[in-house]
């Protein structure tokens, strides 16, 4: 069962804004529950300006939770930057290109340029939030 879409809390928008210059984080909505059509058992899934999280995964009180959110927000920004259908086509093309070149499903996924960018942002947010937590 999915929850109703919710806006990001203002304090989260303020924390993440420096990582997403020029992107309006107020447009993002979060929803608990992954859509039935999504395969691979992801913890999070972005579709345009909506982010779906596995139940219990949306934890804004931890560096890990904020980093996961940043990963998915990166995909929202990619949708916005490239357009829905272009983003989806390039994402899937990259995945299938990897598979056709002998990569495992996981390797192909990890080598999708959009995923590489999202993991880079995720890592930066995690390190920043961890430092803030320690101070």
Which ranges hold each PLM region?
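Conserved residues at the C-terminal ends of beta-strands
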Residues: 31, 54, 79
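Amphipathic alpha-helical interaction segments
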Residues: 58-59, 76, 80, 84
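Short alpha-helix carrying the canonical HExxH Zn2+-binding catalytic motif
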Residues: 62-78
């Amino acid at each position: 069962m999915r929850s109703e879409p919710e806006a990001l809390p203002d304090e989260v928008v303020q924390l993440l804004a420096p990582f997403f210059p020029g992107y309006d984080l107020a447009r993002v909505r979060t929803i608990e529950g992954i859509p039935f059509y999504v395969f691979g058992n992801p913890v999070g899934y972005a579709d345009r300006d909506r982010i779906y999280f596995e139940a219990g995964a949306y934890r804004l009180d931890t560096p890990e939770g904020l980093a996961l959110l940043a990963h998915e927000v990166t995909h929202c920004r990619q949708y916005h930057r490239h357009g829905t259908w272009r983003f989806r086509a390039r994402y899937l093309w990259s995945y299938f290109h990897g598979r056709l070149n002998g990569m495992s499903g996981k390797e192909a996924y990890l080598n999708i340029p959009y995923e590489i960018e999202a993991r880079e942002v995720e890592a930066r947010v995690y390190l920043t939030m961890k430092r803030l937590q320690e101070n």
